[in-house]
């Protein structure tokens, strides 16, 4: 059985998608972030001009970013919180797709989840799994999904392509992501973006 999905994209176009097409969409909103020492991670284009990633990925005031289509840009660090492992980066790129975000509070255990990131040399690599337990109001989402270091900062999404969290770590074999609601709080608290 092939799941059909219907992400409400920034373009406003509504089309049914296969899981593969959802992955293609997620690649469009995911950037590769390269560190000064050759490290690499991922980030999510949260809105035009703004990328969200992990604090441990955003290693300096200026970060080198690469988009899915090969374009490159320099990013400027706007905010960083090592306690919750989130960072916000400003980019000078307005003609880009942006994430459709879903509250993690709506999630149910067993839902299919998809991660996109840049592990090893696999730019835009796909991993899929299921939600380990309902997130509720918890700040972290746990999923039975295979993540690698380059997935850090990239999107964890539902089967419709909605971003539900930012991939952050691996704990006892489970993928861990910071819930989208925590990202919203971080952006509001740091003055980057008003609370929705």
Predicted segments, located by residue:
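Short, conserved beta-turn/loop elements at beta-strand boundaries and strand-helix junctions
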Residues: 38, 48, 59, 80-84, ...
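Active-site region of chymotrypsin-like
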Residues: 26-32, 87-101, 122-196
């Amino acid at each position: 059985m092939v799941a059909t999905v219907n992400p409400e994209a920034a373009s406003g176009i509504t089309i049914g998608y296969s899981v593969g097409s959802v992955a293609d969409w997620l690649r469009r909103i995911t950037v590769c972030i390269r560190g000064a020492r050759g490290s690499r991670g991922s980030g999510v284009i949260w809105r035009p001009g703004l990328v969200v990633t992990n604090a441990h990925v955003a290693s300096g005031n200026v970060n080198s970013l690469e988009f899915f289509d090969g374009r490159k840009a320099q990013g400027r660090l706007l905010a960083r919180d090592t306690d919750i492992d989130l960072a916000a980066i400003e980019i000078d790129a307005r003609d880009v797709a942006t994430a459709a975000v879903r509250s993690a509070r709506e999630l149910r255990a067993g839902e299919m989840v998809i991660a996109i990131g840049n592990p090893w040399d696999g730019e835009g690599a796909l991993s899929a799994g299921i939600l380990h337990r309902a997130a509720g109001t918890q700040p972290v989402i746990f999923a039975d999904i295979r993540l690698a270091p380059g997935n850090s900062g990239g999107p964890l999404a539902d089967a419709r392509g909605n971003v539900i969290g930012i991939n952050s770590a691996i704990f006892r074999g489970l993928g861990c992501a910071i819930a989208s609601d925590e990202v919203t709080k971080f952006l509001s608290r740091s003055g980057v973006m008003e609370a929705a």
